[in-house]
Amino acid sequence: MGNKSKHKGKYNTGSGRVPHGFKHAKSLGQNFLNDQNVIDDIVEGSEIDEQTLVVEIGPGEGALTTELIDAAGYVIAIELDDRLIPILRTKFALHDNFEVIHEDILKVDIKSIVDESMSAHGLTKTRIVGNLPYYITTPIITKLIESKARFESLTVMMQKEVGDRIAAEPGTKL
């Protein structure tokens, strides 16, 4: 990646951590990403730089978010779980290139968010990244495509079976 950001190391990690005993919400399909190699691959593969707006779907406890903030011009994290909102806001409070939106990705107006943020921050490209809940991966991807939002790439983690279905030839039974 080679991009050293002005934001590196500005984290309030003490009170911005997921509390001990935090239970993932099965109803939300939560599976937090914490493998640094995978995180690095996502950031590198997304070709993010300081002219990039990143929209992160489902930031969870912010492991990927940390690297996105370091690489991007601006990061908007969209998180549904109200238990994680104060954790994310605390963890990244020292960053002027981050905001979290407490909303369901399937209900948010992604085109307006992208258009307004690109204009407000003078950014030239948009990347969408995320670790998607398995049971709503297809609806999320469909919504993003149908939204007409301007984004150059979509880099997501998904369950292998979902990826196989998306990549399958029409009419193939999986």
Task: List where the protein language model places each region.
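Catalytic cores of RNA-modifying enzymes
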Residues: 1-174
